[in-house]
Amino acid sequence: MRHRKSGRQLNRNSSHRQAMFRNMASSLVRHEIIKTTLPKAKELRRVVEPLITMAKQDSVANRRLAFARTRDKEVVGKLFNELGPRYEERPGGYTRIMKCGFRTGDNAPMAYIELVGRPEVEEVEEVAEEAAE
């Protein structure tokens, strides 16, 4: 029986799953939107949301915990310098999962997972153009 077993196996052993979600969490924090399969996106939400909640309180201990979970100094810096202050007033629910059809080849359900309230691409391009002038 499968009572009280949380999380999906995703046809991987535990070390592979841990490494995969560490990489995916780093990519999501870095790019703020990634495309993946729907089950992976739903599991990734369980990894990323506690990291952002941790980033709301900037302390050495929290930075070390975040580094232990992501193994990427750049990502830890972005978490605590940008994302923590951005979501200071939001009590959870930092990610959004949007279904985007099925993958060609194996028909796997695909989804975008993004950080809520991320800056739009057009705004970033306009700011870059203004800075160039």
From Swiss-Prot:
Q: What superkingdom heads the lineage?
A: Bacteria
Gene3D superfamilies documented for this protein: Ribosomal protein L17
Question: What keywords does the record list, in alphabetical order?
Answer: Ribonucleoprotein, Ribosomal protein
Secretion signal, residue range per the UniProt entry: none
One of the protein's GO biological processes? translation
Q: Does the keyword Cell inner membrane apply?
A: no
This protein's record includes keyword Metal-binding: no
Q: What Pfam families does its record include?
A: Ribosomal_L17 (PF01196)
Give a GO cellular-component term: cytosolic large ribosomal subunit
- Alphabetized PROSITE patterns for the sequence: RIBOSOMAL_L17 (PS01167)
Q: What molecular functions are annotated in GO for this chain?
A: structural constituent of ribosome
Q: Which family does it belong to?
A: Belongs to the bacterial ribosomal protein bL17 family.
Cross-referenced HAMAP family: Ribosomal_bL17 (MF_01368)
Its subunit composition reads: Part of the 50S ribosomal subunit. Contacts protein L32.
Q: What is this protein called?
A: Large ribosomal subunit protein bL17
Give the source species: Idiomarina loihiensis (strain ATCC BAA-735 / DSM 15497 / L2-TR)
Gene encoding the protein: rplQ
